[in-house]
């Protein structure tokens, strides 16, 4: 019979639903059961799990909702004691409690649930032998408890649980994410305290068991129960390599402030010695950034010298301003070759030291930059080292003048310098450059035309020049261009789907007058890598020291296939070629293209998204006059943004004697197993540049990876490549943590399309 009950009872009875508690009778749902639920109630079960903990029958919580209580028998004494027995059911939307016997003293607020009880919510389920508590103090205690947590699909047990406000104290409790009937790993603690206000828990006398065998013991530990951060030990990283042997580090996380944290990692490398890596991350009103520093003391394979690396990166936006810094330092040229850091810069020849600020206005943009480099390639001569920009100031804008006529403004002033130890004899000094233009773009639905006229002026004030050289040279020239294009489209139906096909021819006529620039210094100019887009540029050089004379007509054709239902570009085809009316007179010292050619190679590319997760990209460059291939690239890839990644590539540059193939993949071969591999092969020299092979096993409670990597490296800087092999191991206890986190960084760098969040 329905019986009203004071609403105050409910918060205490349901306190534990925030702490959550279950096994097969704790709402474990396998795939067959999930399929029987209505579609709106079904939840995804990960491929590697047989099921999840989930209960769709209790609904979602509703604040202030009525409570319905039923029981076979009920009595109310004159003292205000309510007694219920026989199939007692207490229900609210999102919550449900069942028990055999329930008592509530309305005068004191004490209550008891006896002869077994079960509490269910939309977040958890728990079963206990009995429960007692106090509604006014919002506290309760349970004995003989089993529980399940839906968010993490975890389960456990406890001899005793005490609930008060938003805290939970568990005595002699266990925790695991393994499926029912499996105890791959179990964390066991004498006392576990959970504070949901702070988002963290503490455990005393903690034992981690694997297959019921104790693996390690900790007298005390803290751990997160939500996404908030907390200081403590992270799991170690581990690898074994040919050159250094065993490499192990133990990260220690420090949550210093809501906007400041740090990680300190003592490190031991068997063949080299001990060291320390550290990183600090911060957030401020100026943006976000990180500071990192690493040191290896008395490296036994490097004349017992200390070896160091440091880096500062920062990115931020303030109103219309953006700020960026990237400063890197290493103590020696071979640091990145000998010691893996996980940094993407480890393969660079010149390490950046950059600080810049940009202002983005509606019409005008301002750039201020300081830039230098640390070169870590000992084979480079001083003459090959890049210039420093100390500083660079730039102003650009596109003000509207009259009607469709707009002005384009570019002005740049840069002070170029070199290191104090440089003995190349190259000039240094100040360069000012201006390139104002007038342009008028006329456009409608079927095409456009855009004439443009530009003036170029460059002025130098040089510091170190020979006596017979001018210290204030300058350059003035002009250019004009006409860019035009048409848009055609037609409807079509291919493979049962409706598409819109476009045809977009483009003509670009460009004229830049010749001025002798052989006596001018060259601080930062060079030839552009030839590509489809480079054919439609006004200046064929990058930088401002060289203005490339030319009279050229570039012809391009683009065709796209757009899916009418989704608007997705299913296929894009492009082809272009340039034709010269005059030989080019302005060249750089390292010119690649012949300035007397009367036409460029034909270049084309294609990207075909031929299925939801598949794409194919191909690019080719063909010299018509010589009837030979100059460059070709091919890549086909698959990425379902979950567990499968496949890449197959081929790269061919005959002029540079480069012909390489690449295959990489992460493929499931079973519900629990994935194969991981990468192979880069030098077809000309018939040698493997890099091989990586490994496997991953994953179920509800484990993720294990074992990888073997072999790559050719120039360890001595003499140009001779030698093989270096490393074995990587990663283990993660799902919902608890693991070690070997550098494996994720390795896969992100090595396998295009892999992202650790997909796992």
From Swiss-Prot:
The keyword 4Fe-4S does not apply. It is found in: Cell outer membrane. One of its GO terms (cellular component) is transporter complex. Pfam families: LptD. Its main location: membrane. Keywords: Cell outer membrane, Membrane, Signal. GO terms for biological process: Gram-negative-bacterium-type cell outer membrane assembly; lipopolysaccharide transport. Residues 1-22 form the signal peptide. Component of the lipopolysaccharide transport and assembly complex. Interacts with LptE and LptA. Together with LptE, is involved in the assembly of lipopolysaccharide (LPS) at the surface of the outer membrane. Belongs to the LptD family. This is LPS-assembly protein LptD. It comes from Alcanivorax borkumensis (strain ATCC 700651 / DSM 11573 / NCIMB 13689 / SK2).
